[in-house]
């Protein structure tokens, strides 16, 4: 049996870094938070080779006193906490004294800083957490340069995603702090190209407009509510902004971007939706003692002292917005449609494969997406959206580019900076799938031609979802796999939606086309398309 040993400080440092520094975007996050805590009015971020080669953050904050610079790179060295009581009323973004220590342990780090009340500043250079040099300088604010990230932890590098995925995470990180701090100007440069240039503004509405565009922001409905020491500001998209993917769902607690699934679920309950996803921005402000950020190593999750108050307020706000837009939907998913003139009309016809050519069957719908088909030997439950997805997916992959329609008026799509970078670097894949797209500059692309099969769908929504697919990415970009994922996203957008009316002839054609696909049992995302229950099994339910 191996004996228990105390780990060396070098190993402890790398383990700690693994908890705080997951990817280049984690470094950007920690450095931006330090700049904000230093009272910066302007923050500039420079990236080379998606952050592996270099990350540089420059701010005009108050700087670090000369005597504290070396101490800042020691574990649990912080200016934010003096005793246990301070832990209960934290108002700064950083407080544990782990960020600089963790970053320095897995990189080659240089910091140049001068405290506002001192005549000279300090330049310090460290490699793998070890001090290499220190000298006096004259400067303003603070500049932190991170080079060769993960140079001494090669396994960590192997787990990074593709270059454009890592870039997207960096852009998302900077965007989040842009939204939370409209009074600070932000700029972001990736490989010398300006990606973001966001000047100071006075309101959250103006900042959302800067980041996501005025056209999108004008579609958001705003509501604010205060109770005791709680204040919640909600920007909620209506029905026209519902998306097939969870795009812009951002939550800020005391100006810190966080993940909170209970809050997200509260908004979904107000919408009464199962398939599409609302877009929203929530800004929650409450006393520091009523929220605990010390739950997650990267402070991504929070714990509220009185979560029920938060949820009640958000539900009331969301429900009011939804009702005022008159987009509340029917919630009973299992009510049989009384209108039998369309898909739910009892019909009879011939098809093939799982239905013998001589076999006559009947069908009707239950809920808004399931068709029940009667066979001699049992019944089949068919998700017609999933079935249509499978059919369209294979058309898109195999025949899409054969029927291209030139648009009379080219369609210009304005994207947020994160989506723009993702799409721009993968335009060649879109073109191979028959979507004739070009970079249009100013965070925009232009669509000049589309495959016949998708010419009537929401192109902007589809492009946003393709960007989300690309952001998920893989560690080793596989062209074929990326192409399949994009085709699956397009198929989802071009397929029949739940609640759409289709007649029995269309059902028949859909079943026949489904049988000709390579995998009629699953949609492109792997979900089941149909479920067969034999008559013998049904009889067993009744002990027959």
UniProtKB/Swiss-Prot annotation:
The answer to whether the entry has keyword Cell membrane is no
**Which Gene Ontology cellular-component terms appear in the entry?**
mismatch repair complex
Q: Which SMART domains match?
A: DNA_mis_repair (SM01340), MutL_C (SM00853)
Q: Which Pfam families match?
A: DNA_mis_repair, HATPase_c_3, MutL_C
Keyword DNA repair listed? The answer is yes
Q: What is the stated purpose of this protein? A: This protein is involved in the repair of mismatches in DNA. It is required for dam-dependent methyl-directed DNA mismatch repair. May act as a 'molecular matchmaker', a protein that promotes the formation of a stable complex between two or more DNA-binding proteins in an ATP-dependent manner without itself being part of a final effector complex.
UniProt-listed PANTHER family: DNA MISMATCH REPAIR PROTEIN MLH, PMS, MUTL (PTHR10073), DNA MISMATCH REPAIR PROTEIN MLH1 (PTHR10073:SF12)
Q: What's the protein called, per UniProt?
A: DNA mismatch repair protein MutL
